[in-house]
Amino acid sequence: MPAMAMWSESDYRLRRADRIESSPRRTAGNVLAFAVRSTQAGGVFTMNAPGHRKTGNGGKPFMDVLIRQTMAENPHELRALGWAFSYFFALLCSYYIIRPMRDEMGIAGGVEHLQWMFSGTFLAMLAVVPFFGWITRRWVTRQFLPRMYYFFIANILIFYVLFQSNLTHAYVARAFFIWVSVFNLFIISIFWSFMADTFSNEQAKRLYGVIAAGGTAGALAGPLLTATLVVHMGPVNLLPVSAALLAWTMVCIHRLIAWKHATVAVNPAAGAALGIAATDRTAENAMGGSIFAGVGLVLRSSYLAGICLLILLFSSLATFLYFQQAQIVRDSFDDPATRTAVFAAMDFSVNAITLLIQVFLTGRIIRRIGMGWTLASIPLLLMTGFLALGVAPVLAVIVVVQVLRRAGNYAVMRPAREMLYVVVSREEKYKAKNFIDTVVYRGGDAVSAWVYAGLQGAGLAASRIALLAVPLAGIWALISFKLGRRQEQMARAAASPPHDPKRRNPS
């Protein structure tokens, strides 16, 4: 029987939804979607030689098995995955193009002032939170997200004009350093809020690893673009390139919104099968509330307060480890070029390991061991790492601990951490999450930096400080485990029928 004849009515309607969402252009997602449909219908990918059918797992086509086990369950979902991947790729590529300029501006602003610039970043975060709260009060998601990116694009172009006018005052350099630090956390927080608002809990377990891989690929492509173009264009002229990539993210946002709406509007049953609930009318309205609603939401929810503790411990221990790394590498090598080479090798190892885990293992790990153990795995790893540093604070140990910690965080813990927000309300996804990811995160950075400096000033060696961090990592692991279990309870409660006795609000 021809493959076309084997399509169900729901497949046909979803195909019509695809056309509504993407017409008139055809993207790579269309080709992938058609290939998967053909495979599901018993066909083969035309990439294979004629007559050759690559199979496995009970005779199923190999690519079908690979896609189903690592990514989307159906071609329509694969399209959304492609747009989300592209969105995160462009976002982090844009950031990593300007990140080297930020580091240079940090030096230009005075190395002796770096701790004050960290504090300035925290104060800037305090100003951003009410600004974001005001925006979400006035506009719906499809309106305020593009406006936020227009704002950041305008900021980039303003700095471009300032640098082109040879305005190189130290205050401009410091302002750029602080702005990029705010920009980084803010855009990533908003991205994951939007993902939590787009995909269901079940979809997030399968797709977040691959979506995160898009960010990793962007983080690799950004420095590569910078290294390739900076010789010919100069660092300042890379700012419009960063702005152009940021503009592309708005296309991805509109496509993802259209994908969700088209799926539910054309066939609500098919939308439910994909894990998309019927359209919530409140999603079409602005969220309203106070501009400081994020703070209030956190204070009223023990679940969100637990996430705050998780982020505080995460950022504090990461700062401790960063200071340990700086001390050990400084004492191991006198040559700045050698130190740079060590850091570059570590970054490459982290990104390579992260990308492989995100694409092939993240979803399986979360589904296999559950949210609790997934979230606790990296704190337990770091607890072991600090214990090792307490015994042997040497280069080999810090390199292994940092590479494994960073790769595990990006590949496993970050996607799982973002899943904590899938089960909360829309207002909490945007307002509370933004407060936690910016003010709480940078607050933890700032406080822990001064605490570490105080411990050093008190005469404690790096090994002693590492041992002090061990129980903190244990507390972090316990909180992470409990939050993961709580998230699973809330997800089950949300999936239960309205009158089911199991349906309750654990928060």
Which sequence ranges carry the predicted segments?
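C-terminal ends and interior cores of transmembrane alpha-helices
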Residues: 151-168, 381-393
